[in-house]
């Protein structure tokens, strides 16, 4: 699971970030689950919040207490004032929550399958 922007080529490199990851893990049975484009940030946040605790009080995503970075992100990441965009000014935050959010949004999306580009 990952950020679709990692598939972009940069003028400073002949390979994408995801090609580097794929080549590094070539000897392992890893399934690459990177979408062609990222989901809307709000959709991803809603999917994560729904897994952490939905309207019925169900908790379907539990975080191991050893996951200090993810816990810190969940406690401190917030939207920009008056916006639906995540505030990313602190470069030490959002990496762990973004990563878990990509997985949750793909596997437990609140949006129908046709949004995700699956052929039915």
How does the language model describe each region?
Residues 1-87, 110-111, 117-120:
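Mg2+-dependent endonuclease catalytic cores in nucleic-acid-processing enzymes, primarily RNase H-like
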Residues 90-111:
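Acidic, Mg2+-coordinating catalytic module of metal-dependent nucleases/exonucleases
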